[in-house]
Amino acid sequence: MTKNFTVPLIILCFVNDSLAQNEKLPYVEIPKHAEVYTAGAIVSRMIDGLGFRFYWATEGLRIEDLTFKPSDKARTIAETLNHIFELAQMIHNTALKKDISYIQNEEMSISEKRSITLKMLKKSSDIFRNTQNIGQFKISFNRDGKQSEYPFWNQINGPISDALWHCGQIVSHRRTSGNPFNSKVNVFRGIVSD
């Protein structure tokens, strides 16, 4: 019986991966900035910058890039991408005012994780952009019934900054593995040059 499902399952995984790669994802370019400087608009722009960097840091990764790590004690690019996925969940759950919980992602392909990460960042950015009181968003953990809460400041120096840091690691690692970041990407302007 198992043999009957093996080939369709492999094809389904391949089709899902192909569809995810052809899907129009956010952050090919940074969205237009807000007209007014507010705390919410600034946080939104930080997340948009993260989304743009993540999009291009992970665009065009090869199998050999995903398994690359510069030393035995370092994370592979795939492990780093997975960590950014978890950080994006923290940002997203905070935007939704939910306790931090993680999506089980062991069965997801890299392209699925990438797609979901970008969509979570975009949704979070949209929520924060239109917020007048950023202080209402707390980082909330519920571990085995024990609740702990942190102010939004920790979101800035925690998950947002950490994810930016790790995007830089992916760019560095992929350069070392022989597949450099697209040189036409202009992170200052948030565009890709022709």
What do these predicted ranges mean?
Residues 106:
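A short, structured active-site edge motif that brings together acidic residues
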Residues 60, 83-86, 119:
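Residues within well-ordered alpha-helical secondary structure of globular protein domains
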Residues 53, 57-58, 123, 127:
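Well-ordered alpha-helical scaffold segments within catalytic/enzyme domains
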Residues 109-167:
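Acidic/histidine-rich alpha-helical segments that form the ligand environment
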Residues 1-26:
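Bacterial Sec-dependent N-terminal signal peptides
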